Amino acid sequence: MSAFVGKYADELIKNAKYIATPGKGILAADESTGTIGKRLASINVENIEANRQALRELLFTSPNALQYLSGVILFEETLYQKSSEGKPFVEILQENNVIPGIKVDKGVVELAGTDGETTTQGFDSLGARCQQYYKAGARFAKWRAVLKIGPNEPSELSIQQNAQGLARYAIICQENGLVLFVEPEILTDGSHDIAKCAAVTETVLAACYKALNDQHVLLEGTLLKPNMVTPGSDSPKVSPEVIGEYTVNALRRTVPAAVPGIVFLSGGQSEEQATLNLNAMNKFDVVKPWTLSFSFGRALQQSTLKTWSGKKENVGKAQDVFLARCKANSEATLGKYGGGSGTGLASESLHVKDYKY
């Protein structure tokens, strides 16, 4: 029995289980103002609130796309925004059986005593902010920790600091009614092979779940948002089947069965590659006590963004592209994706070194 004593236990378990519904996944639309500015700049669109709102409205009102989503991660600005018709985005999502979530961290800062490793900030007034987000309709939260693989990295200090930070955030969120996404992202930057990534992933996840248990976090009211286990960005590529096997094995060794779902970040992979890898994991024939799904940002939005290009007349076409990507990833969560949605834009790599958002 969990030592969790918060009043929201039943609600947390119910919401986490729903988010992990097979066939559904997460749209990560929580880019900071600076990061979405870079995305808009790539299509020559000015970074003003009206344009940020227009992009989010395009996504949230795409006909038939939301049936493939169980949650959407929002940035604070977006949590309070409305559609052009005056309807709050939160209501639009809720009416389509999509749970709104919120990014609660404030980005990373350098961890003193390390060679450029980082820790995540955002604990100031976190409890009060969670209360406000809950009142606004959010029912889950995301906190991103970032680790890197290098000659001596991640250091033990970095692993422990980030694990303890994730656990501290987790219990504060749960005490205020928010399911938490635990996101210890190991960057793909580097020339390491897939076995090295697997070993580091296992070490980091083991530390995270030790810290979560020490903080009496209710695991049934959490989801894990990890990196896929892949070779470094400067290493030779391997097949989706190899990535699927290494990833699932690493998770089976470290993630308790009490966790209802694991939703992967795309980590700069192309849209199509991320989908193929997710499909391979779900086809890998071993016992998996949790659902394996997606929590993609760039890998759901990039070709949609390019198709839209900030023009009203392109909204319909862009929404069709978004629907196709949502459907493809839904199929991948069931191990039923046959490929073929990756022509053109969907095959472009989205890797950004030392990615921050």
UniProtKB/Swiss-Prot annotation:
It comes from the Eukaryota. SUPFAM superfamilies: Aldolase. The keyword Ribonucleoprotein does not apply. GO terms for molecular function: fructose-bisphosphate aldolase activity. It is found in: Cytoplasm. The keyword Cytoplasm applies. It catalyses: beta-D-fructose 1,6-bisphosphate = D-glyceraldehyde 3-phosphate + dihydroxyacetone phosphate. Pathway: Carbohydrate degradation; glycolysis; D-glyceraldehyde 3-phosphate and glycerone phosphate from D-glucose: step 4/4. Its EC number is 4.1.2.13. The record marks Y357 as: Necessary for preference for fructose 1,6-bisphosphate over fructose 1-phosphate. InterPro entries: Aldolase_I_AS (IPR029768), Aldolase_TIM (IPR013785), FBA_I (IPR000741). PANTHER family: FRUCTOSE-BISPHOSPHATE ALDOLASE. This is Fructose-bisphosphate aldolase, cytoplasmic isozyme 1.
